[in-house]
Regions:
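Aromatic/hydrophobic pocket-lining residues that form the small-molecule binding cavity
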Residues: 44, 112, 116, 211-218, ...
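Polysaccharide-binding and catalytic clefts of secreted carbohydrate-active enzymes
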Residues: 64, 148-258, 262, 273
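Solvent-exposed loop/turn segments at secondary-structure junctions
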Residues: 2, 65-68, 136-141, 245-246, ...
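Short glycine/proline-rich turn/loop motifs
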Residues: 14-38, 96-103, 182-209, 233-236, ...
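N-terminal structural segment of carbohydrate-active enzymes
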Residues: 1-129, 137, 144, 223
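Aromatic- and acidic-residue-enriched segments that line the glycan-binding/catalytic groove
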Residues: 3-14, 69-87, 136-185, 257, ...
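Active-site-proximal helices and loops of the catalytic beta/alpha 8
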Residues: 120-128, 137-138, 146-153, 220-223, ...
């Protein structure tokens, strides 16, 4: 962490840099990655009554899995809640260190895990559902299987979990170890894709699967949270699946079968987004035809709503808004239409109300300094 770093107050002006951030000499977009507001699961528990009074019926939790980053899409352990979200990080790390992460029989419940299950129970008492967010497409470099791979190289039993392009040669002073990271990001090693029978092309559904060992580990984690003590009433209510289009449909069909075998009522929503960034959104139909997801994150509704309500250079009228929404609506099966995750904001997009004041064509130009 930067020198002098501290937790940022909740009401802090978003675009104002903290004193410690200024001292780093980094621009806002770089320094903000170090920002933390200090939230934890107890804080969510404390707000459940407030959320219930607002009429909230489901909580979509961004990744809670143990990970070093602020976003948690760089998993260190899929099967544990991040130790910093619970009451005893030191004790939890000792528990995790005592396990064999490859063997579910050795998995224990940390204090953070137990607090999360308490959150699930309390949410259920209030008629709320809990949806967990996972990225099965990649892990972080501190993920236990990847660390084993780095240490043992071609002798690692996990060498086929990832796309290794070259192993280190111990006879040379250089480190030749190289692997494929998600979208080239070396902090996010990608799980190996197998059994591809159609072209894998960004922004398009394709037929394929993932490495069997990684797949079975993912299934074990899935069952753990759906029925933590063998009783689905004490488990979560569904999953939001990150970068779903980067994984083949074969895996998702198998994943759906596993989920439904444990909890027939579980809700599955996939994140699909760009066919061609930043103008053409993906076709949701391959993912919402009854054998993959119940829904997708429906940015197809967010975009025309913004163009109608905001005063941008891409403004549309009421008829165009209606036509756009009906086009998307009519592409979906009747059972899926009311299940879509229609977003007014996400962790990847500005709040829709805030975005009404963004005069630019694209929502990612949300900084007022970018107004044209």
């Amino acid at each position: 962490t930067p020198e002098g770093w501290s937790v940022t107050p909740w009401t802090w002006d978003w675009y104002r840099q903290e004193n410690w951030a200024v001292k780093t000499g980094k621009q806002f977009n770089d320094a903000v990655q170090y920002r933390r507001f200090g939230g934890d699961l107890q804080g969510v528990l404390n707000k459940l009554d407030y959320l219930q009074n607002l009429g909230v019926t489901a909580l979509f939790m961004n990744p809670l899995n143990d990970a070093p980053s602020l976003h948690k899409y760089d998993a260190r352990n899929y099967h544990h809640i991040d130790v910093n979200f619970g009451p005893d990080p030191v004790g939890d790390n000792k528990i995790i260190a005592s396990e064999n992460p490859a063997d579910p029989k050795t998995w224990q419940w940390t204090a953070a895990d137990k607090l999360f299950l308490k959150l699930v129970a309390e949410a259920h008492k209030r008629g709320m559902k809990i949806i967990m967010d996972y990225s099965w497409n990649h892990t972080g470099t501190s993920f236990w299987a990847f660390e084993d791979l780095v240490k043992y190289q071609e002798k690692s039993v996990y060498k086929d979990w990832y796309n290794v392009t070259s192993f280190d040669n111990p006879a040379t002073p250089e480190n030749e170890f190289a692997f494929e990271g998600w979208l080239g990001n070396k902090f996010l090693p990608e799980i190996k894709k197998v059994d591809l029978t159609t072209e894998r092309k960004t922004g398009h559904a394709y037929e394929g699967n993932i490495n069997e060992g990684a797949k079975q580990h993912i299934f074990a984690v899935t069952k753990r949270w759906l029925a933590p003590d063998g009783d689905v009433t004490n488990g979560i209510d569904g999953f939001r699946l990150d970068v779903a289009d980067h994984i083949g449909l074969g895996f998702w069909r198998d994943f759906r079968k596993v989920v439904r075998s444990v909890q027939p009522e579980a809700y599955l929503v996939g994140e699909i987004w760009w066919e061609q960034w930043p103008d053409q959104l993906m076709n949701p139909v391959p993912y919402t035809s009854g054998d993959v997801f119940d829904a997708v994150m429906f940015y197809q509704a967010y975009r025309p709503a913004r163009y109608f309500f905001a005063r941008t250079n891409t403004e549309i009228n009421a008829q165009q808004l209606k036509d756009s929404l009906l086009y998307q609506w009519n592409r979906l099966l009747p059972d899926n239409r009311y299940a879509m995750m229609n977003t007014s904001s996400t962790h990847d997009s500005p709040r829709l109300l805030s975005d009404f004041y963004n005069t630019n064509k694209y929502k990612y130009h949300a900084n007022p300094n970018e107004d044209k």
